[in-house]
Structure formats: C-alpha cells, structure tokens
Swiss-Prot record:
PANTHER family: UVRABC SYSTEM PROTEIN B. It comes from Thermodesulfovibrio yellowstonii (strain ATCC 51303 / DSM 11347 / YP87). The keyword Nucleotide-binding applies. GO terms for molecular function: ATP binding; ATP hydrolysis activity; DNA binding; excinuclease ABC activity; helicase activity. This is UvrABC system protein B. Residues 626-661 form the UVR domain. SUPFAM superfamilies: C-terminal UvrC-binding domain of UvrB, P-loop containing nucleoside triphosphate hydrolases. The beta-hairpin motif is involved in DNA binding. It comes from the Bacteria. The gene is uvrB. Its main location: cytoplasm. Belongs to the UvrB family.
Amino acid sequence: MGNFKIYTSFKPKGDQPKAIKQLVEGIKKGYKHQVLLGVTGSGKTFTIANVIEKVNKPTLVIAHNKTLAAQLYGELKELFPYNAVEYYVSYYDYYQPEAYIPETDTYIEKDALINDDIDRMRHSATLSVLTRQDVIVVASVSCIYGIGSPDDYMSMHVTLEEGMKTERDAMLKKLVEILYIRAEEEFRRGAFRVRGDVVDIFASHCLDKAYRVEFFDDEIDAIYEIDPLTGSRQKRLQRIFIPPNSHWVTPEPRLKKALETIEEELQERIKYFKERGEELFAERIEKRTRFDMELLSQFGHCHGIENYSRHLSGRLPGEPPFTLIDYIYAGPSKGDFLTVIDESHVTVPQIGGMYEGDRSRKQTLVEYGFRLPSALDNRPLTFKEFEHRMNYVIYVSATPGDYEIEKSGGRIVEQIIRPTGLVDPKIEVRPATNQVEDLLEEIHKRVSRGERVLVTTITKKMAEDLTDYYTTVGIKAKYLHSDIDTLERVEILKDLRLGKFDVLIGVNLLREGLDLPEVSLVAIFDADKEGFLRSERSLIQTAGRASRNINGTVIFYADTVTDSMKKAIEETERRREIQMKYNKKNGISPETVKSKIKDILSSIYEKDYVTVDVVKEEAEEYELNEETIKKLEQEMKHAAENLEFEKAAEIRDKIFKIKEKMLKLGMKLTV
C-alpha cells in the first residue's frame, strides 16, 4: 500500500500541531464528522495535508468552484510530489445544457466546448482512484454528477505485455471498442497510429508521453514509452495499461440489452403521447430516439449518450447514477476514504441544491417529447445519497454552518492562531446617519498610506451612487456586482491591488479566498439591517477581508447593535485575544501578508455545472407575466407617493428587466 509523504521545509506552527493531533485522533476513534474551524491565513490546507499523511487514506477534497479547486490542487501537489494528486472538475469551457422553453416553442440543443486538458485530468483521476491507495482528488461539485460505470471502465481496458500473443488487428479492434480513433496525421490524446508492425497509442490519461507497441508476427516484440511530439523512445516497458477514451463505455452484450430496453421504453412513451392526442410529441420522441439508437448500435456512442446511462449501466428506475465516488469505492480503498469539504458553509448547500436544479430542466424535455423519462436518471446525487456515500468527513470553514456543527456533534477543532502573527481586525461601530462623510475621512487616511478600502452596501443602486459620489470628490473608486463577468472581475480586483484605484464598493464582497493584503479597511454600511448579507457568519467573513493587513480595521455603520453584530464582534474579539497572547508569548511581530499580484486569479469564482447562488445580491426573479408588471407598477407609484424615490427607482428597473426578458422570449406585452 502506498504511503503519503509530505516534502516541505515548513513545520506545523501556531494552532496547527494541536489541530492536526485532534483531527487524526478523531478519525482513529471513529468520529465520522469533524469540523476544522480555521480563520483566514491560519494555514488550513497545510493542516489538512498533515492529517492526510498521518491517517494514510485516499482523500476526496471538494471545493465549491473550479478556481478554488485548482488552487488547492496546486498546493497539495506541491506538498505531495510523489503521491497521486488529481484534479476533477467539469470539463466544459463553455456549457449550454439542453433545454426547451414551451412559451415560445424554443428548443435549445446542448452545446459545449470541452477542455482537453481537464478531460485528461478526469481520466487520470479515475484511473488513480481505481488503481492506487495514495491518491488525493481535488474536485468541484462535478464529483456528484453521473459518469459511466467504474466496473465497465476497468473491465474494458486494454493490457499489453512484452511477449504477449495477439494479432495487431485484434488489438486495434479492441482500441476502437473503447473509443480510441485512428489518426495518422494528427496524433493526439485518445488516438492511435499504425505504421506497418508498429502501433503508437496516446492513452486518454497521458499528457506528455505515449506508447509504442512493436509486433513481430502475432507477438508483441517490444513496448516503449515515447515522446508524442517527436516519436523518440524514452524507455522500454514490460507492460502497459490503456484505459477507455470515455467514461461512457459499455460491453457489447450489455449494449445489445440496452438497445432492447430503450426500444421498450420508447414504445411506452409513443403510446403515452398518442393516447393524449399529442401526435407531435410522439413523432418527435420516436425520431430523436431512433437516430440515437442507430448511432449506438453502429459506434457504441452518440451525442448525449449520458441520457441513456440508466439503460447502458443496467440500473433500475430511480437508482442513483455512478459518480467519481463510486470509482473510489471500486478502488483498493473499498470505500475507506476521507472527504474534506472546503468552505463547507458554501459547499454543503451547493451540493444539496444540484439535484432539483438539474431535474426541473430535464422534466420539461421529457414532457414535450425531447427525451425519454429515463433521462431523468442521468442526474447528480441527491444530498441524502451523497451523505450515504461519505465515510470520514472533515468540514473546513472559518464560519461553519448549522448542518456541519450538528453533524459533527459539536466536535469542532479550532485553528485560530496565524503563524504570521497577524491579528483579526478591530471592529468599530459608528452611527449610520453620517456614514458617507465619515467614511470619506477614513478613505483619505488609507489612501495617504497607499492602502485600499472595501465598502459593502445593502443595494446595487446604493453601491453605484456611492461610487459616483466618491468619484466626484476625487476618490478613485469602482464598484463590483453580480452582473460583471468573471474576466472583468479579475481585472477590477487586479487593478485594486495594483493601485489603479483605491476603493472597491459592492453589495456582496463575500468572496471566501479573496487574497487582498493591501486592504486595511472594510466598511459595512447599514450593518444593523438583518439578513443573509448581515448575518453573523457573513459579517465575520466580510470583516476577514481586512485580516491580511497589519493595519486592518472594520467599521460597522449602524444605529443599533443587532444580535448578529454583537456575536460577530464577540467572536472576532475572542480570536484577537488568542492571537495576541500567542504573539506575546513567542515574541512575534506581525507583518502584512505579501502575495504576488497574479495570485488574484485564485479568488475569482467560476461556475461548475449549475452553480447554486448561496449568497444572492437581489431577490429571486419575479414570474414573467403581465400581472407581475401591473403589481410592481402599483408598488412603484405607492413608493413615489411616500417620497421613497430610491425604492421607486429600484422597482422601475425591475419592471424594465422583466419586460426585456419577456420580449427576448417572444412573449406578448400589452402593458
């Protein structure tokens, strides 16, 4: 069995040794759920790495977006250079799911651009968990989405050995069966090329190596690892393992059976539609399904093959799909593995929200004859199914949610001390009545020292107006909101760090992982307005944005002190005292964190499948109909009569948005 081994000159410091010891002991005692409550900058990843090394179990690390997953992957790969550290996220650079809009009779075909590097890494991840014990997979929510059967993936691989008796053409046929293609000109991953008795194979999990198999009559004479670009031999091998080029591979007998059961379901569905007089839907489902069946029978594959996964894997209706987690169970660990859920207060709700979002879209496709009902079984796991598959779990967060605290039975391991000595920012409460002018004075102080300021407001309108006002009085300010796309978000945050502007204003600056050491002041307007963005957890997370700077300060602008504010202040003060006591005892003088400007990319959120917005910047969309518009117009007039002009303007903007969406969907408007 392979053992995990960390290679680094760093040693655990501060709270890390205690946290590592407690978590390891908890696992040894059989505690299935534990919480690591670690503040920003306390080295939580290093702690988790040490736990992995000591418990020596295959580990699944789940992050709530691709970029944070990539950051964790990079850190763990550096710490474990001789173990298998893998990356498993959605392989789509662009993803438009298949959908149907009944109101306009609009069918949107699935459209996707697959990232070849990520596809390779997914193959590498599944192969590692199936064949190794010393494996860490850093994944996004993709790990609960359906892929093909691990048993089929393993049983259909091709193993080749020097001296093995096999015909060249028989081997080529096997490669085609597991979806490799012949490519003489463009030799790429998932392809093979033939030159007489020499066959080069570029396996699905390989990056910078390929294999050369040399035949003599009906025997493998030699096997080499080669450079795929130059074709030069690197080393001689005795044996190679070629996994399928897709996770959706099916043995021929099961494929034949699957086509029979698809036919049976198709006949039932045609009958269902005809009995209801829905001839168009009956014709549609027959035409579309028969086209796919023809491709499956000829090539073993078709566009949207995942929609037939229940038939292809032989599962019963309603049974959960195979996921990455099933591959872990099928490997050497047999399910004895560790799961680490990073930023659990965000990731846990996201995992829980995947199933319903996926089902509602597919339900419409089924109802209107675009897909068979069995397509609903190509889905992510429900939260209960996910829970059932977990073994040992560590939830990692600076502000763990109620679910994590309850599941752990209060077994919370704290990591409050930062090895750098940085102390949590001091929180001040000031009156909201003069917040704009008061903050202006504070901004001038920070700008004169070359520091930056973050400001959070209650509404987007207020963020925009505040930005305009500060700009007119000579402050270099910008605002950030949910309508700004990922790439522009990168640039804005990068420019803030570079000093191209000094003040960033927004509604939701709750970005766990935001690395902005130049920020010395976080101002929270209307901190006493209770709600998700002013909850205890949100206030602590937002305040944490100033924790990387030695001059870090937080100002709560409020006319009253809410329960959430009180708890956030008390918790921050508790953490400050622990850190200051440690600093005094060890003679540590804290310094502002120094990080390269390029690191800003690690803080940008990318969507993976349908990312659930746990933190919303505005209310859920209204229903798209004229009744809604009339109702909102009445509310707008009422607000104007009461001299609530800002509220009236917000309602007016919502009405414009609804009308714009209705027109885009081809819906009639008479108001």
